[in-house]
Amino acid sequence: MAEVQVLVLDGRGHLLGRLAAIVAKQVLLGRKVVVVRCEGINISGNFYRNKLKYLAFLRKRMNTNPSRGPYHFRAPSRIFWRTVRGMLPHKTKRGQAALDRLKVFDGIPPPYDKKKRMVVPAALKVVRLKPTRKFAYLGRLAHEVGWKYQAVTATLEEKRKEKAKIHYRKKKQLMRLRKQAEKNVEKKIDKYTEVLKTHGLLV
């Protein structure tokens, strides 16, 4: 059986519910999905309202034994994971298997920092929300309700961006050198190029 291709999504700039709905559908269909930069996910509505909603949710607990649940996740990645879980039949075998196919991260840890990340246009804030509408960042909400790693994640992101910049600069330099090398030998290999073209090996 062929290996299932992993779909790596960049959560930054996406709306929470819309992205969760698309991810839920994909994992049910059998795709493996990884969502990175969950702290950059947006929620429609102003920040204060969203915070009040979450604080109301924090008050929901089992009076006699709060350790039995419901569990209130503080990390943005876990808040997103819980949102997706609510869209899956997670108490069935099929739903549990679908949830196992989902991975969520704050920031972009290795090996996903070297992989191509995708966006979902149908869930992007700039596409789905009017420019005048207010929105909140999931990272800020999580930080204000008890997530302790906002600063750590931000520092690691800065380091990753610096590394990526250096890598891209090197890549551009190599491409420039390759182009120059091709130009230098263009006249020398002209006759071979023509032969290859006549045999249909070069277009």
From Swiss-Prot:
Its main location: cytoplasm. The keyword Metal-binding does not apply. InterPro entries: Ribosomal_uL13 (IPR005822), Ribosomal_uL13_CS (IPR023563), Ribosomal_uL13_euk/arc (IPR005755), Ribosomal_uL13_sf (IPR036899). The modification Citrulline is found at residues 59, 140. GO terms for biological process: cellular response to type II interferon; cytoplasmic translation; homeostatic process; lung morphogenesis; macrophage chemotaxis; negative regulation of formation of translation preinitiation complex; negative regulation of translation; positive regulation of natural killer cell proliferation. One of its GO terms (cellular component) is ribosome. Phosphorylation at Ser-77 upon interferon-gamma treatment in monocytes involves a DAPK1-DAPK3 kinase cascade and is causing release from the ribosome, association with the GAIT complex and subsequent involvement in transcript-selective translation inhibition. Citrullinated by PADI4. Transmembrane segments: none annotated. The keyword Ribosomal protein applies. Component of the 60S ribosome. Component of the GAIT complex. Interacts with EIF4G1. PANTHER family: LARGE RIBOSOMAL SUBUNIT PROTEIN UL13 (PTHR11545:SF3), RIBOSOMAL PROTEIN L13 (PTHR11545). Belongs to the universal ribosomal protein uL13 family. This is Large ribosomal subunit protein uL13. It comes from Homo sapiens.
